[in-house]
């Protein structure tokens, strides 16, 4: 059955891997939101399976108006429903000392990583409820094990990033409780080999942290694993915080 999938932050890293993975699935319309569609030639050149197509939409996740406008433009492309939304856009990086970090730094992470997916959910909810796939629509928030209070002792100093992901997890849990007609969960993709992750790793090393044991998966591998979880999603997954292998993570 034809499917419509929306992925934020689709121009690089895991987002691009997700776009490529869904475009390789027949009869799939992929809506990739990006900050500047004119600079996404590599996305447009991705291989497409029979019946699949790509729509690039400009969206800035820190702006409620931008999110509302972007979702509003879908009607002009005859898109009246969405089956899967993956809130992938985000920022990451270490914070050397939370006590010394300005509130503005913490707010920047929260605006992108927590409030962004929250505002996106509100904007796409009518389209998710209009899904005619025969199954419940899905909203997946790409989170991080760094947002787990139980796991924070094993991480490099990512207090601002971790706090924003912990807030995102809380919002996802509450949205799932409020909207039982949609399957909603927070998804840890694992350690994905992206430019953003490498930049954070280099900075952490410069601060003296030994991360030699850390291993990465490719964006494509991670995207395939996430798609497999989405394809098999059940109502029981809603409101949970899942690891890359589908096991449940502690909040």
UniProtKB/Swiss-Prot annotation:
Signal peptide: none
Gene name linked to the record: gsfK
InterPro entries membership: Fungal_SecMetab_SDRs (IPR051468), NAD(P)-bd_dom_sf (IPR036291), SDR_fam (IPR002347)
EC numbers for this chain: 1.-.-.-
Similarity comment: Belongs to the short-chain dehydrogenases/reductases (SDR) family.
Active site (record annotation): 143, 161, 165
Protein residues bound to NADP(+): 14, 33, 60, 88, 122, 161, 165, 192, 194
Entry-linked Pfam families: adh_short
Keyword Ribosomal protein tagged: no
Entry keywords, A to Z: NADP, Nucleotide-binding, Oxidoreductase
Function: Short chain dehydrogenase; part of the gene cluster that mediates the biosynthesis of griseofulvin, an important antifungal drug that has been in use for a long time for treating dermatophyte infections. The first step of the pathway is the formation of the heptaketide backbone by gsfA which is initiated by priming with acetyl-CoA, followed by sequential condensations of 6 malonyl-CoA units. The resulting benzophenone can undergo a spontaneous dehydration to form norlichexanthone.
Biotechnology: applications noted: Griseofulvin is a spirocyclic fungal natural product used in treatment of fungal dermatophytes.
Name under which the protein is recorded: Short chain dehydrogenase gsfK
Pathway recorded for this protein: Secondary metabolite biosynthesis; terpenoid biosynthesis
